[in-house]
Amino acid sequence: MRIERLYEVVRAPHISEKSTLAAEERNEVVFKVAVDARKAEIRQAVEQLFDVKVRDVRTVKMKGKRKRFGRLEGKRPDWKKAYVTLEEGNEIDFLGGAE
């Protein structure tokens, strides 16, 4: 896979209370990924970008929220997130040990 596609597939880490608990309890990392990305592509991208071994990938398509600005109504775009379970002994630290 080309390096450009790797960065298109894995867009950003998704940091939330739920994803932090998943990282601590189940060695899972949550990413925002491209809507057209397949599980095999996500696995390959994470393994190559972060130099870790992936055990499992689960994906969820998220609906964009409806938003209003005065009388104008709009909708945020739909997006996809991936729960990536890492093999034992592998970890990705996005916060750099910040307390």
UniProtKB/Swiss-Prot annotation:
GO cellular component terms, A-Z: ribonucleoprotein complex; ribosome
One annotated GO biological process: translation
PROSITE patterns from the UniProt entry: RIBOSOMAL_L23
InterPro entries assigned: Nucleotide-bd_a/b_plait_sf, Ribosomal_uL23-like, Ribosomal_uL23/eL15/eS24_sf, Ribosomal_uL23_CS
Domain of life: Bacteria
Classification via Pfam families: Ribosomal_L23 (PF00276)
UniProt family annotation: Belongs to the universal ribosomal protein uL23 family.
Oligomer and partners: Part of the 50S ribosomal subunit. Contacts protein L29, and trigger factor when it is bound to the ribosome.
Protein name stated in the entry: Large ribosomal subunit protein uL23
Record gene name: rplW
